[in-house]
């Protein structure tokens, strides 16, 4: 049995044990799956922390204030960012239920441009770079939904490039989906991702990734305009959907439409591990799931104990 088969087997047994309420056995197999993944796709948390520090140092308030002079005036893009398993797919289903919005899915656009932009230093902030990135991205979005007023991109890892995206599109809407860190980490730990994705799925590596992610998104909150960087708490969205959804739709510059309250009726294709959930009405079953696994959290427990994480009830 090769590594991919062992990974699928452990995740399948873990899921079956979770369904039966045997959380100790489930965690045993989820941990085993994580070990298989780490053996084949290692992740360097120290290098990621250094990259995070560099992005924070480069994306100053003064640079972000230059966006109107550097970027496109087009307001088409709606970028839904956050950690994987934080509710980004649900948010896309909600927003793209609006008749004037097209669903772009997870677009691998900004990662390549972001790497070039970041490595080029000062040269990356020149207007021609932003203009070409904006024009290329708009071509991608228009190919997906030619007549839509807004088009979503729910690639969660775009949280890395929020500064670049704002420079290219100062009128774009960035929606940051936040969810309890332990619930998110547990869901990541239990999910099969693409085998080439160099992303931690458990243990101290995932905790370190979370902390770098939160440092970076804390920075975006400080340096990006509050009306362009919108934050949504998953727990609030599932507890009182309508006021949260109304705020999101207004932030996108759209008139209200009741279809946004029924995302399960949205026929758009979902090609992520969240596909099944998006076919259900908005529910709270995934809130505070981590409590079932509390005795077996291991390093993930520090996400509760680090003084920053609210424990949902």
Language-model regions, residue ranges each:
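Short, flexible loop/turn segments with low-complexity composition
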Residues: 45-49, 260-264, 311-313
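PAPS-dependent sulfotransferase catalytic domain
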Residues: 101-104, 109-126, 130, 144-309
């Amino acid at each position: 049995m090769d590594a991919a088969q062992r990974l699928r087997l452990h995740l399948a047994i873990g899921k079956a044990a979770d369904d039966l309420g045997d959380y100790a056995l489930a965690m045993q197999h989820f941990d085993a799956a994580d070990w298989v993944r780490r053996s084949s796709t290692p992740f360097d948390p120290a290098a990621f922390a250094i990259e995070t520090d560099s992005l924070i140092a480069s994306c100053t308030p003064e640079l972000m204030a230059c966006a109107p002079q550097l970027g496109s005036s087009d307001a088409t893009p709606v970028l839904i960012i956050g950690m994987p398993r934080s509710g980004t797919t649900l948010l896309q289903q909600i927003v793209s239920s609006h008749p004037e919005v097209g669903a772009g899915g997870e677009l691998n656009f900004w990662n390549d441009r972001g790497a070039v932009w970041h490595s080029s230093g000062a040269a990356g902030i020149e207007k021609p770079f932003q203009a070409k990135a904006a024009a290329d991205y708009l071509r991608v979005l228009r190919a997906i939904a030619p007549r839509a007023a807004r088009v979503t991109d729910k690639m969660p890892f775009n949280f890395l490039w929020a500064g670049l995206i704002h420079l290219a599109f100062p009128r774009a809407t960035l929606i940051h989906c936040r969810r309890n860190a332990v619930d998110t980490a547990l869901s990541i730990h239990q999910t099969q991702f693409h085998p080439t994705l160099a992303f931690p799925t458990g243990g101290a590596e995932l905790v370190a990734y979370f902390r770098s992610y939160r440092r970076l998104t804390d920075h975006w909150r400080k340096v990006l305009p509050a009306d362009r960087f919108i934050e949504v708490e998953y727990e609030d969205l599932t507890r009182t959907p309508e006021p949260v959804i109304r705020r999101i739709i207004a932030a996108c510059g759209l008139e209200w439409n009741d279809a946004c309250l029924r995302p399960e009726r949205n026929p758009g294709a979902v090609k992520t591990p969240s596909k099944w959930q998006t076919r259900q009405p908005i529910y709270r079953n995934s809130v505070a799931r981590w409590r079932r696994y509390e005795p077996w959290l291991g390093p993930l427990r520090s996400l509760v104990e680090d003084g920053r994480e609210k424990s949902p009830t």
